[in-house]
């Protein structure tokens, strides 16, 4: 019975662990080649890569011991590695988008519009404060004029 499960499980290990590992290595090379910054979120990526290699090694080192506990252990290892892989793929995609020129252009435009909005607000506040000063100066002047000497 265990001999029938083994090739299917090894195929699952190959496609769901080894292929994402290759994708990560490509993305990591791409990110390190085209950015000036060290990406700290790649540290858990290194751990998940090591974890993936451990799972692959575990699948090859215990081929004859096919009891239910080892199958369950390997299943959970694959599941945890998949969850880590999707999380890291999302993180790396976000970093790639942030570092891209298109995102930088969008951010610069947003900064420009934000600066112009703040300048307009500052001008409006300055006009309002000038009007209030003039009004208060006129009131003070009128009060001073009315006082008998």
From Swiss-Prot:
Protein name (database record): Uncharacterized protein MG384.1
Taxonomic placement: Bacteria, Bacillati, Mycoplasmatota, Mycoplasmoidales, Mycoplasmoidaceae
Keywords: Cell membrane, Membrane, Transmembrane, Transmembrane helix
Record bears the keyword Transmembrane helix: yes
Coiled coil: none
GO cellular component: plasma membrane
Intracellular or extracellular location(s): Cell membrane
Spans through the membrane: 12-32, 42-62, 69-89
The organism of origin for this protein: Mycoplasma genitalium (strain ATCC 33530 / DSM 19775 / NCTC 10195 / G37)
Domain of life (superkingdom): Bacteria
Bilayer topology: Multi-pass membrane protein
